[in-house]
């Protein structure tokens, strides 16, 4: 008599997916709500905007610094194990943020929170395919994309409501029980794993140089840095030294060989470009809607949430579409919609009112939902199982580098175009001008991503045709 196969019951899969879903939602929630926390922090701590900006930048630096390490350690030590540790660190850091007595304490806690978030994002993306059959991989990516968008959508609205009623500490306290719930679901139902076959220690020199390069990059992009051009020079030098050290390492920190596939390389670069646009949109929206139309912050938060909410509703249909027509057509469709939306925002007329801003934003986020689901499915889904964590780490790294560039670089450009060190003092016309010019630049970035998607696909088709010719000759 044959031995029956042991299959996990549906409830186990549901709890496991719930844990991965919360591990995807919470980092996005922690990131998006900070935009509305900044004004309250400025009033309580009495610090300038340049210091407040580091509440955002520190979180992104924490995420970005650990994305590749999380993927490597996940492949080597076990993805479930590292996901549990990362979620625990995120919960602890959320409590430390709420207890922060100074802006320096808060920035340090946000860095730690970002480190935990990196493990959550990378490992949830890498493990999603393990809980569903290959035919439903697009569905699982759509689920994570939906929850990611939900986190981005809930951040501004919940942040605004909680800050108004209970102070800026309340949003951080809300993250604590949710993180503990994610930890419980993952602990109970995610499949246990063994350490990977990879051996050898972590290249600490490469890691230190990478963190130094990222820190200098963040300082260089922060407007008003007293160090002048030195952070930019430091970032360049540290990156050159990192490439030299890492290329000579026995087990390099960045698995750059994984970028050899044309489609994967194009998807990772496009992810960075799109992420820079989306985070800049979240940063610009509150200042434009509040300053140009005198809307209260509660209304502003609800309006900003509508775009990510639409993306959340589009995530599952996007996954369904990917499963049926393939990832590449959906990537092109999503980027095309985003280009149209960015052009409309670049031509924005303030006489159209808040609705004139909101409608293109809705189109932009719908396109983003299509792009993210299809791109994640193509980049991570096509990787081999042993390297899926590393590929997910590269994808998350590119996205967070884009977010860092958008928050510091495009945000600084927007402030410079407004012509005021303090954006609260900018006039409605100055804010409208800064918004139009910034979105004109984002349209160019999105056009570059669309061109890149087409170029990489043609390269893949050329490789396939060349392989076919060589097979025919043999």
Write out the residue ranges for each language-model feature.
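Intrinsic disorder in cytosolic terminal tails and internal cytosolic loops
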Residues: 1-12, 454-474
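Transmembrane-helix signature of multi-pass solute transporters
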Residues: 89-99, 116, 178-185, 237-241, ...
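Helix-loop-helix hairpins in multi-pass membrane proteins, especially solute transporters
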Residues: 67-69, 75-205, 351, 411
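Hydrophobic transmembrane-helix bundles of small-molecule transporters
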Residues: 164-270, 277
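Extracellular/periplasmic helix-loop-helix junction of adjacent transmembrane segments
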Residues: 37-65, 105-107, 293, 298-302
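Helix-terminus/helix-capping segments at the ends of transmembrane helices and short amphipathic helices
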Residues: 39-42, 128-133, 138, 142, ...
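12-transmembrane solute porter fold
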Residues: 13-36, 49, 124, 165-174, ...
């Amino acid at each position: 008599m044959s031995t029956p196969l042991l299959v996990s019951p549906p409830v186990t899969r549901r709890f496991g997916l719930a844990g991965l879903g919360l591990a995807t939602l919470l980092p996005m929630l922690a990131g998006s709500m900070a935009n509305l926390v900044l004004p309250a922090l400025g009033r309580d701590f009495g610090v300038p905007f340049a210091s407040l900006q580091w509440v955002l930048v520190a979180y992104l630096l924490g995420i970005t610094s650990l994305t590749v390490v999380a993927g490597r350690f996940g492949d080597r030590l076990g993805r479930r194990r590292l996901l549990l540790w990362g979620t625990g660190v995120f919960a602890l850091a959320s409590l430390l943020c709420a207890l922060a007595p100074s802006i320096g304490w808060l920035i340090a806690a946000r860095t730690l929170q970002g480190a935990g978030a990196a493990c959550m994002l990378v490992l949830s993306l890498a493990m999603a395919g393990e809980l569903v059959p290959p035919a439903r991989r697009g569905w699982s990516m759509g689920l994570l994309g939906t929850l990611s968008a939900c986190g981005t959508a809930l951040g501004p609205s919940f942040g605004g409501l909680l800050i108004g009623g209970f102070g800026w500490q309340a949003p951080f306290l809300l993250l604590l029980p949710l993180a503990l719930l994610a930890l419980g679901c993952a602990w109970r139902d995610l499949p246990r794993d063994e350490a990977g076959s990879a051996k050898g220690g972590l290249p600490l020199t490469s890691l230190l140089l990478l963190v130094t390069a990222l820190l200098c990059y963040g300082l260089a992009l922060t407007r008003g840095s007293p160090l002048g051009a030195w952070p930019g020079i430091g970032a360049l030098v540290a990156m050159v030294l990192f490439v030299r050290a890492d290329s000579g390492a026995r087990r390099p920190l960045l698995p750059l060989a994984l970028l050899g596939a044309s489609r994967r390389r194009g998807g990772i670069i496009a992810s960075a470009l799109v992420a820079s646009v989306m985070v800049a949109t979240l940063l610009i929206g509150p200042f434009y809607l509040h300053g140009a139309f005198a809307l209260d912050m509660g209304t502003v938060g609800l309006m900003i949430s509508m775009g990510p909410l639409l993306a959340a509703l589009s995530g599952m249909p996007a996954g369904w579409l990917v499963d049926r027509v393939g990832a590449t057509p959906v990537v092109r469709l999503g980027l095309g919609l985003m280009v149209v939306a960015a052009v409309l925002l670049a031509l924005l007329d303030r006489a159209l009112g808040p609705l004139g801003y909101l409608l293109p934003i809705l189109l932009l986020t719908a396109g983003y939902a299509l792009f993210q689901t299809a791109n994640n499915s193509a980049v991570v889904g096509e990787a081999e199982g042993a390297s899926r964590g590393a590929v997910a780490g590269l994808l998350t790294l590119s996205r967070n580098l884009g977010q860092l560039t958008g928050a510091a670089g495009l945000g600084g450009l927007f402030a410079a175009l407004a012509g005021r060190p303090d954006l609260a003092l900018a006039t409605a016309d100055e804010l409208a001008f800064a918004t139009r010019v910034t979105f004109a630049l984002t349209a160019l970035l999105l056009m570059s991503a669309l061109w890149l998607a087409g170029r990489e696909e043609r390269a893949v088709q050329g490789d396939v045709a060349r392989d076919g010719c060589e097979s025919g000759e043999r």
